[in-house]
């Protein structure tokens, strides 16, 4: 399973949440409401979650292995970094090449960003 598209909306906020993202897997399945969070150890991608009746948060969707989690993290953060100049509140997209180059474990994103 590969991340084939990332859509991101940067937020204008003083909170730790910096952006919301949606990812497409294998051009067939979309997961909405991933969050880019500014944590104690830097930026990271949080999976969509909901609050349970006891006040805890539980992931709605999440990868079950570290390789998929890393691929999602890299794809989302790549778009976040590439859209540094995009006005907050604007939706930015970047399609991930369907022929991902696996050299040195680097995932490459296509160069066309749409605002």
From Swiss-Prot:
Gene name for this UniProt entry: spoVG
Highest taxon above the source species: Bacteria
Parts forming coiled coils: none
Entries under InterPro entries matching the protein: SpoVG (IPR007170), SpoVG_sf (IPR036751)
Keywords: Cell cycle, Cell division, Septation
Function per UniProt: Could be involved in septation.
Pfam family, one: SpoVG
UniProt feature, compositional bias: Polar residues: 91-100
Keyword Cell division: yes
Classification of source organism: Bacteria, Bacillati, Bacillota, Bacilli, Bacillales
Name of protein: Putative septation protein SpoVG
Family: Belongs to the SpoVG family.
Gene Ontology biological-process entries: division septum assembly; sporulation resulting in formation of a cellular spore
Region (Disordered): 88-115
Species assigned in the record: Macrococcus caseolyticus (strain JCSC5402) (Macrococcoides caseolyticum)
